[in-house]
Amino acid sequence: MNIGERALLFLATNLGSVRHILSMLLFPSQIKKAKVTTVTVILASMFSVSSLSQASADGITWTGQTAASTNQWRAIAYGNGLFVAVATAATANWVMTSPDGITWTGRTTPSNNAWRAIAYGNGLFVAVSTSGTGDRVMTSPDGISWTSRSSASDNNWGAITYGNGLFVAVSTSGTGDRVMTSPDGITWTSRTSASDNNWGAITYGNGLFVAVSSTGDGDRVMTSSDGITWTSRTSVANNFWLSVAHGNGLFVAVSSTGVGNRVMTSPDGINWTSRTSAANNAWHSITYGNGLFVSVGITGTGNRIMTSPDGINWTSRTSVADNDWYSVTYGDGLFAVVATGGGGHLVMTSGVIGLAARTTAAANAEAARVAAAAEAARKAKEQKELTEILALIPSIGELTLSLGEATKSLYSTKCVKGKTTKYVNKGSKCPKGYVKKK
């Protein structure tokens, strides 16, 4: 498609710019005089607005929410537009779900095990437990309907993650089999851990699975590129490392013990550096979202949350209550935390749920509004614009215009034969029968 044809397509689609485009094509002197207001309106109608004001999940201001029941909510995950929490002890409904972190609904589980951890991956929620016989795994495609699955062994499965097409769970018990993996969350296979430490947390990031433990001597970290073969790594201290997360190119682990060193970080999962926590609380969980690491704990007075933009420098935040905050996750603009006990609310949130969806909807609405305004302007000005075009062309009835040729007027020689006009490259001869015109 040549320049003229592209111009024709533009004109056919955007009549509001007729006067400006044609005046440029036919009279180069008009280029400097051309205004861009019409083109600006049209371009605005072609794109969604990306500069809308957005709220953010800051991890600073927290709000208490009412759980579905006063169960011991031990873990929470987010996936497919839903927050899902599981409990280690309950009177009923050992699972609860929420689309916004505010309104929670109890769900029935296939067994009343002590569900210790949950993860989402490949369209599936998978939870693991520390109790039960041959049924320490359950899965759900929607967080509502759950199915019991056979675990590789009856170990105390305390953590699970998903990465590289694989679910990987780790445990605090067992002999040489404290890891199990599954490609689908249904069929599980025992794997040999680097050591028989109490592996209580695992994450995946940058092509690597990283697990941390609360026992062991200088080897409280292990890593694996495939979830099958594991290697011991040196931890910075023999703390009770209870949670690990990956974000912004960094692995960050937190512990419930230690003095001034309850955080450690690593860019590769292998080499770790001690960091100072905001307080010597018993930090039990950490997550990353919206450019922020957030950790929660079960001890401390009014400061059971700490946040960090880089995993290195940490700041204490005020929790809604001094509850036993055991797990935190992030999803769609919202941090959500659950507790196993304490007074008042057993859920707290920070941020605004649905930022992505709301921003998209608002952008689409704004684009539609701008497009409608452009269309109204086009209709109102079309007659006036066409009248101005007639004024720009002295003898439009005597001129045969080919846009593919007309665009060449900006840089070519004009050749005339009767009522027909053509343009050739400067320096070239006019076609036979045509006369060069200045």
Question: Each predicted region: which residue ranges?
Answer:
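Long, low-complexity, compositionally biased polyampholytic IDRs enriched for Lys/Glu and Gln/Arg
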Residues: 359-392
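Short Cys/His-rich micro-motifs in 6-15 aa windows
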Residues: 434-438
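Sec-dependent N-terminal signal peptides
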Residues: 13, 33-44
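A short beta-strand micro-motif
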Residues: 413-417
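C-terminal segment of classical bacterial N-terminal signal peptides
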Residues: 45-54
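Residue-level hotspots at or immediately adjacent to binding/recognition sites across diverse folds
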Residues: 56-358
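N-terminal secretory signal peptides that target proteins for export/translocation
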Residues: 1-31
